[in-house]
Structure formats: C-alpha cells, structure tokens
UniProtKB/Swiss-Prot annotation:
Homodimer. GO terms for molecular function: aspartate-tRNA ligase activity; aspartate-tRNA(Asn) ligase activity; ATP binding; nucleic acid binding. This is Aspartate--tRNA(Asp/Asn) ligase. Residues 194-197 are annotated as: Aspartate. It comes from Mycobacteroides abscessus (strain ATCC 19977 / DSM 44196 / CCUG 20993 / CIP 104536 / JCM 13569 / NCTC 13031 / TMC 1543 / L948) (Mycobacterium abscessus). L-aspartate binds at E170, R216, H448, R489. Transmembrane segments: none annotated. Residues 575-597 have a biased composition (Basic and acidic residues).
Amino acid sequence: MLRTHDAGSLRESNAGQRVTLAGWVARRRDHGGVIFIDLRDASGVAQVVFREDAVLEQAHRLRAEFCVEVSGVVEVRPEGNANDEIATGQIEVNAAELKVLNESAPLPFQLDETAGEEARLRYRYLDLRREGPGNAIRLRSKANAAARSVLSGHEFVEVETPTLTRSTPEGARDFLVPARLQPGSFYALPQSPQLFKQLLMVAGMERYYQIARCYRDEDFRADRQPEFTQLDIEMSFVDQDDVIALAEEILVALWDLVGYRVPTPIDRITYAEAMRRYGSDKPDLRFGLELVECTDYFSETSFRVFQAPYVGAVVMPGGADQPRRTLDGWQEFAKQRGHKGLAYVLVGEDGTLGGPVAKNLSDAERDGLAAHVGANPGDCIFFSAGAAKSSRALLGSVRGEVAQRLGLIDPDAWAFTWVVDAPLFEPADDATAAGDVAVGSGAWTAVHHAFTSPKPESENTFDTDPGSALAYAYDIVCNGHEIGGGSIRIHRRDIQERVFQVMGISNEDAQEKFGFLLDAFAFGAPPHGGIAFGWDRVTALLAGTSSIREVIAFPKSGGGVDPLTDAPAPITAAQRKESGIDAKPEKAEKAGKPADA
C-alpha cells in the first residue's frame, strides 16, 4: 500500500506517529509562509501542514484535486485551531515528504459548490469524490451486504438469471439485442427475472434471491431509469404472511443502517381502503388530511358537476386566504393530471361559504358542508367529481401537494404500510391511459403481472367477473413511495391459461411466448411466492435523497441519455450489417439453428 493510514482515521491517539497518506487535495491555503491542505480520501479529510523548506516549495505547485502522497508526523493542533466539524479536527500532519502522483486539469466545477445535474453526470467521476454522492454509493453497498446477510441466514440461494432472453410481454417495452448468429432474430433484456425465478421454484431451489439488473424501454417519466436494480426474492411452500415476515426482517436490517428501528409487524391496509382514504395505492402516512366521501351528501343536488358516480373532498387548513392567482394555479394542477379543473369552496372566518361552487349549492347543502368534511373557518375545501378511481387519484395528488405547501410532512419521519388485496385486473384502456403497456388484446389486463395468483376466494370466478377479482398481492410503501411489491404466484397451468384468456392471450400465443413456463407447471410445480424491492428507491430513501440518480454510480439523464459516454449512439454501417438487424428470419428455421449466410 502507498499509505499507512486512512486520512479520516487519524485521532489525537495517533500524535507522534509517522504516517503516510494518499489522496486528493480538497483545498489549499497559504498563511504567512506556511501552506495547509485538506487531504481527502474515501475515509474522510485530514489537514496537512507544510512548514519545512524541503517540501514547502513543492507544495506551492499543488492545486485542487491533485493526487498526492504525503508522509509526516501526526501532531495535535495548536490551542484554538481545532476544527470540531470534522472527525480529524484535533490533529494535523506535519509533512516531511510530498510526492505528486498525478496532476489535475482545471475543474469543470468546484467540488465544494453546487453544480448543475448535466455537468455532474458528465463528470460523474469527479462528482463522486464529493462527500454526499460518494457516501450514497457506499451506503448502497452496505444495504446490499445487509440484505445478503438476512437472506443467507435463512439459507437462500443467490442465483444469477439470464440477461439475454426472449421477448415476453410483461407490461413494458423490451430492449432488444440482435442475435448475430441468427440474423433477424433478437434477444430481449429482462424487465425482471420473474419467469426464471418461478422456474427455479419448479427446479426445487425453494429459496432464491438476486440483486438483479432489469431493463424497461419506456417513456422516461420523472426519476425513472431505463436500467434499474431489484432485490428479487422467491420462496416455495409459502403464503403471503411468510413473504411479508421475511421482507420486514430485511427492512429492519436496512433501516438499522441509518439508526431507525422499523416497528414490526407493519400495519396493513387494503387497496380499496387506501384509495378511499388517501386517493393513492401508495399513501404517505406521515400526515393526515384524509379524503372525505361526499357522494351521498350530494345525492340529490341540483349542481350538475356533483351529479356524478363519485364526489369527494379534501380540506386545506387555512387555505381560504389563498389569492385568486393561487386558486387558478390549482385548476392548472388538475388539468396537468387529465381533469377539467378542481372545484373548491372557501370557508370564511364567520363560517360562510364562498367561491363559485358555493353559489350553486342549496341552503341545506351549504349549511352542513363544513361539518360534513371537517372544515374549520379559514379552510379551503377542494372537490373532485366523476369516476371514482380518477377522481380519488386527483384528490390524492391534491392531498400530497397541500401537505408539501403547508409543511405538514416531517422530513425525518418514517411511515411504512403494506397495501394488500389489490384488483387482479384493470381495464386495458386504463392501463394505456396511465402510460403502461396493456398486455394482451383483451378488455382486461393484469394490474401487477400475468403470473399473480388470484386470491382463493376469487379463483373460481375471476374469469367470469374480472372486475371483482382480487390479487394475492402485497406492496410495501414507505413515505408515499412503493419500495417493493410481490405476490403469491400461479403454479397451475389451468389457472394460468384462464388468466391469459381474460387478458386476450390465446392458447396459441401463450404457448408461443410462455410455453416453457406452462410446460414446467406440468412437472409438480410447488406453490410459491415472492417479492421484489426497488433497490434504487430503497437506497435513495436511506440516503435521504429524493432522486434515485444520487444512488446510482453512473445514472442516465431524464431522457435516458448518458452524458458521460454519450450513449446511446449510432452504430456503423458495418456493425449494422454484421448484426443482421435488417434480416428477415425464416419462420421454418428451428430455434438454436443458425440461419444460412
């Protein structure tokens, strides 16, 4: 090793020892013929002082981010010069030798200053030298180790599943890779290890896990990445409670890393209750502001807007004094989410109701409205009316925005919940409208994925009454983020084929795309279930950052572009020809047999 000690490890107990450090010049300061540098390595920072003529002249050459090796004696800092803000603030190293290992070009941005995201991603290797970004990646490594420790303790087997497989419809678009030896044919990068982990259960592995790379070619909404990571888990001979218990053990180990003890068992809420009370299937429970049902209250209203299948409300405390411009902004807020607007009523300090909606209500409706929704003088009541699902979703968004604007969310709080009993299917048009891919050609598509088992009480009726069928599924939510989702899987061919039929996937298509799984079910497939944690989101929460890019070593920008390598990039004509990307495959050729040149 070039060094004897890590810079961040030095303490007063090291005083008098000769040490050799290696790292980067974080800062240089000249004081009356003496030069100080903050030497930074992965462990932290130590102050180095250059007093001796032999090294002083060399030290004058040092600039920010020069890579150096320094030898000297650890000394306690003079009285009054200690720095209590850093762990090594009681000592300094009196340098006797200095070696410049490599110089640095002028920096594109100062590492101790704020920089734009584009510059940070383009020079990510510099960005990661900073304490915050570097520590986020190190915390992710600790999270990996903590999860592996829990799973190893339960005798799970870590298995790597293929990253070159066939394209199967799973709810998003595949990234495709041309197969050079079979011109016109393509591999697909996996959207998840779902099918392979189920096959591992058929294979008798019983307990599997993998920190898996996954790929989805989708429109890049806020904070999405084309490649992402899951902690993927599958177990045989289990029910929902078994998987949840293991998942909670992992969560406890993870949050122990940041000094928080997750209380277990974690509360559960049904999907229906979550939507009714919070307008979201991933509710943030760090604050109240529950939705209020108003459908029955306005059942005989003459106000046409409220003559709807569903009417609901959410109260904004103190919101009655919002200026007109702000209230108009709420209309734009609703329109951005696909709604015509957001109705509101202002409760005056004397209890009278104001605003355009109040004028259209009957005296009886006005008199009892504040009490019905729990509004006080000075509050604003927001309403949404229409189809229950979309109206509740809008109110859920309003609820979150109100909490943000009013500072109702404790940034240091943690609130976990399981959301269970979600629908097994949703209308295909709803999935498409939400930006998802509706698998199959039927009127219904799977809410989670096509391999989720119906709950036992829905097993005999899910194909005759798809809208009422419940999934044997469970999602874990933390602070309004879905950080994991799982289900008990289908392990019988007949049930799987019935699910496919509901989704408009014919037996022929099912055999072509999923025949390997269906065939495996014929060989004593055991009951099994599992869960996958969104590892980027989990580690972002642990690191205290709102963006998953902060916990990915080399993330893509919002458009799926890598500013560092400038990927994706065009290929050459020679590469295109060699890959066979334009060739048309011969249908008669057998899989695994190369096409003729």
